[in-house]
């Protein structure tokens, strides 16, 4: 990393005015040589939304500047809502999205890594969707969804139930079957909602992920494609489950994570019909 040195003028100049000129020139040149200071970290606002008698914890990240902004619902995996999720939420906000992330485990005091699906948690995520749609700084259009592992199951359930509210879905190694379904259904079919939704779906998964998860992604991909729903499946070579944040990331997984971030941004912008600056236009997606 290069060091920045003070800039000296070639010859002395008159006091006061000269000093001001020197400071201005030095500041300009130092900025050019060193680059602008890094932007402050995106802050997260903690809040709650109500689902029946339950207060659902949510975190909200906003882009810099004034809204309205395109809105994204972030749905975490069954491992829980953690710092890696917070960084993903901040990154989405830096890309220009107003993001709300409900903690669907905490709302019902569910332990991390639950061995079954708790249907009540779907209402918690839906309550966050309703709050996000009504947010004063959200564009008045369907929201995008970024979801991980168990999260895409929530997403397709919501997209089938509230098609007017759900726009494009970005799925990271997603589960496209009811986790409580019998084993034969886990192996040979997908959730019935996959046959109903119209939301464009981008699937991001590694080719070294678990075989069952790769199979259910493949089945969901073919079913959506056959129905004419916009869908793409990005399979990353040599990438394992949680390739985008795992502590022992290989060089290939680090590149896959960067590529996935670019694909995520492009998918959301395309199917939310945003302009080149990432602003809402009100146009129909193409």
Model-identified regions with their sequence ranges:
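Short beta-strand/loop motif that positions the catalytic acidic residue
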Residues: 197, 203-205
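Primarily recognizes the serine-hydrolase "nucleophile elbow" in alpha/beta-hydrolase
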Residues: 127-196
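Serine-hydrolase catalytic machinery in alpha/beta-hydrolase-like enzymes
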Residues: 44-62, 68-135, 242-248
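C-terminal catalytic histidine-bearing segment of alpha/beta-hydrolase fold enzymes
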Residues: 230-286
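Acidic catalytic loop of the alpha/beta-hydrolase fold
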Residues: 208-212
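Short alpha-helix in the alpha/beta-hydrolase fold that links the catalytic acid
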Residues: 213-223
């Amino acid at each position: 990393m290069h060091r920045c040195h003070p800039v000296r003028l070639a010859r002395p100049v008159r006091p006061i005015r000269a000093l001001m000129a020197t400071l201005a020139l030095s500041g300009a040149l130092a900025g050019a040589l060193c680059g602008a200071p890094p932007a402050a970290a995106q802050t997260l606002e903690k809040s709650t939304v109500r689902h029946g008698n339950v207060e659902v914890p949510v975190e909200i990240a906003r882009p810099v500047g004034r809204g309205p902004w395109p809105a994204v619902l972030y749905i975490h995996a069954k491992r829980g809502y953690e710092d890696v999720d917070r960084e993903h939420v901040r990154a989405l906000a830096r890309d220009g999205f107003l993001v709300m992330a409900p903690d669907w485990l905490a709302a019902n005091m569910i332990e991390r890594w639950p061995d079954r699906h708790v249907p009540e948690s779907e209402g918690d995520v839906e309550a966050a969707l309703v709050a996000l749609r009504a947010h004063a700084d959200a564009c008045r259009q369907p929201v995008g969804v970024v979801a991980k592992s168990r999260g895409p199951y929530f997403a397709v359930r919501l997209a089938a139930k509230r098609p007017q509210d759900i726009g494009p879905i970005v799925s990271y190694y997603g589960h496209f079957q009811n986790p409580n379904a019998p084993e034969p259904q886990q192996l040979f079919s997908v959730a019935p909602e996959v046959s109903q939704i119209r939301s464009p779906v981008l699937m991001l998964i590694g080719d070294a992920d678990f075989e069952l998860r790769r199979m259910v992604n493949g089945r969901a991909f073919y079913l959506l494609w056959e129905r004419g729903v916009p869908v793409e499946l990005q399979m990353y070579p040599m990438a394992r489950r949680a390739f985008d944040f795992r502590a022992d990331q290989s060089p290939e997984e680090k590149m896959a994570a960067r590529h996935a971030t670019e694909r995520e941004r492009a998918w959301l912008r395309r199917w939310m019909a945003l302009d080149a600056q990432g602003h809402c236009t009100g146009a129909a997606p193409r």
